[in-house]
Amino acid sequence: MLLLNQKREFYLTILSFFFTLSVSAQQAVVYGTVTDFQTGEPLVGVLIKADKTNARTVTNNEGFYRLVLSGRQRVQLNFQCIGYKEHTQSVTLQDSLRCDVQLTSAEQVLKEVTVTAHSEMRKLKEAAMPVSVIGQQQLQGTASNMNDVLARTVGVTVRNTGGMGSASRISVRGLEGKRMGMFVDETPLSQLNNFIALNDIPTNMIERIEVYKGIVPYKFGGSALGGAVNVVTKEYPPVYLDFAYEAGSFNTHQFSTVFKRTNRKSGLQFGIGGTFSFSKNNYEMTLANLDNRTVKRDHDLFNKVIGGMSVKATKWWFDEIKWELVFMKTYQEIQGIDLDIREAYNRSVNYVTELSLKRNNFFLDGLDFNFDINYVFGKYGMHDKAMNRYDWDGNKLPPVSAYGGEQNNFPSDGNNRLNELISKLNLQYTIDMHHSVNFNAYFDHNSLHPKDTLMDKALGFRSNFPSKMNTLTLGLSYDLTLFNGRFQNAFTLKNFIFSSDSRSINVFSVTEPERVKVFKSYFGFSNAARYKFTPDLMLKASFNAEVRIPSSEELIGNGYSILASPALKPERTKGVNVGMLYRHLKADNGLIEVELNTFYNLLEDMIRFTPDMIPTMARYRNFGSVRTQGIELEAKGDVCPVLYLYANGTFQDLRDVRKLTPGTVVENPTYKMRIPNVPYLLGNFGAEFHKENIFGGSGQNTRLLFDASYIHQYFYDFEVSRYQERKIPTSFTMDAAVEHSFGNDKWTLTLKVKNLTNRRVVSELNRPLPGRYIGFKVRYLLR
């Protein structure tokens, strides 16, 4: 069993130091947001220039801008954006001054303007590819965690194996696991799956979630095939306090808090926060492998603590310098299915630290610099030393090994050590409003030192060895926009380089491990385009031929249950996406959106997790070729000022296209059969009623929410017969919530019910999932 394989990648980070130059004490900072006058939505890529100076900047993805000016004089700020009327604002400089601006749409676009930062080009790049964006409203309500939110997104499937802390896999259009890029604020999460999962990030701390399909934006770095999930955390005002606590069924408790404070004079922002998650996961489950016997889970406790601090400077030579330090500790019991496991557990402790540097106009007007360097240190291991095993009747059974062990055939007392250094450099040069180039370099050094003397003693030989892995991904991109922004195109060329140094055990002679060194280099490319026929209707198309470098776990193992696979080939893919998007702003400022996408993908040298001949061990192997094709449709909008509706559906067909059994000339018996354990038909729909001051008074808001999810039955083995019983039944679940805030969102109370009808739901190899969950959440917000 993979150690904490439910832990997915999250945000990684570092240790390093950097000296910087401070600016004159006479400098002042003007900052704020730029929004659309009609919709209130943030505007990306608005050019802001200070009159009679060379100072200029553009708004970021949240419509936020920051401008450093000298002196204490009165200046004119000029705001320009394609499709909007030019706006001029007069301000008197102070140490720190907020200036929020609303722009009015213009019938004629502005003439060509030189943009000197990468935000506008980032907007163009993201607009050209298929992407779903999940905002703050969807992050609250019935959702208790990020997986709940992602599961309602068109084309996305989240498969869990249990309750809180259980293993889960996120797939986009059928491609899942390590093929999906996982990012936090555009930073790849790399090897943190042993320590933390995206699902561990509290929804209160998230501004939005971006789900990219098919193509991963070049500025993210790293290698991914099926798409990417990017979690964008919140930008906080000068003073901010957020406290949330939720209690629910199965003895579940979740707590999170964030405190931020900014010194206006120095421009330093200090932050501290943390989360605490606890659940016994003691729900009843029906065991299909034991004649549908019902038992109560009694060894599935999960406990995780995360604490962090940060310091950010905004008045030094760099526009932004940020240092973060995070600590994580996890304890998780292992729940038995076939047998009643009573003692085995996983544990991990991890430290991550990061230094990030940002500077617009980096020694050259129009050149923007963004650099991150991170360091990760962690220890983890599975502990399974029980001298007895038990069946579900309480009968005592002897262990398979004389040294004990109940989870596997051999015991384990792992104490594995991981060291990782990650850095990412992004340089964006904007030539003019039509042309931009980007260079991205992502480097990852991973060093694993496994140790499990008890397992080695029981096996009679050493099964895992220290290993190292280096990866370097280089990307060069060109962005083009024409016809007053109606046509956008982004072309990216990437070079994937990796090397590893590990030892491989010959299954026929386990006493002589062989040292294996690997060095390989591959190229890939992608292109995405978008054309607007009208302000409301656009066509998107993209093509990619890319490579995914095997992760360190796949290539060099994990130190206790996964062996090294130095001969593993990278996965390669060729894919096409074509879609139409209709987005209409109603007279009452309500928004209607309808999007249709079709997609085709051919994945070669697919990597799969398979058992090994060595007892208790497994390794990753190349499976062959898989073809994916499908269609997805989503419609959502404001029916009236108080009612919002959404619905989406996905059909994804994954087929085995290997004509021959690997390594033989024998015909493949599963040729053109559907890939097992992957849902192929799914849909979601929901509604939200919202109204202010429904009970009288002022500063109050009430939301009633309903969500439903449908997944058609599918097989968890190849469908060789229509009567085959190895299938996961159709599931239809409903969630509901009531949310009421008062004091202008200072206090928010939420009552939520998940799986309203208490329907029996199974997933991932027929594993039973929790039944009805009832939770109550209170949140306090000071800003």
Name each region found by the language model.
Residues S266, K532, K540-N544, E571-Q629, ...:
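Membrane-embedded beta-barrel scaffold of Gram-negative outer-membrane proteins
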Residues T35, T39, K49, Q80-Y84, ...:
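Short, acidic, small-residue-rich periplasmic hinge/interaction motif at the N-terminus
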Residues P238, E246, R264-A344:
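Periplasmic-side early beta-strands and strand-to-turn transitions of outer-membrane beta-barrels
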Residues D100-V101, I201-Y240:
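A beta-strand signature from Gram-negative outer-membrane beta-barrel systems
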Residues E593-L602, R621-F715:
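Gram-negative outer-membrane beta-barrel transporters
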Residues K312-K329, S348-S509, E514-P535, S542-N544, ...:
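Face-selective signature of the C-terminal outer-membrane beta-barrel domain
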Residues V131, T142, N147-P188:
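Extracytoplasmic beta-strand/coil segments of soluble accessory domains associated
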Residues R66-V68, T187-K213:
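Short acidic/polar hinge/loop motifs at secondary-structure boundaries
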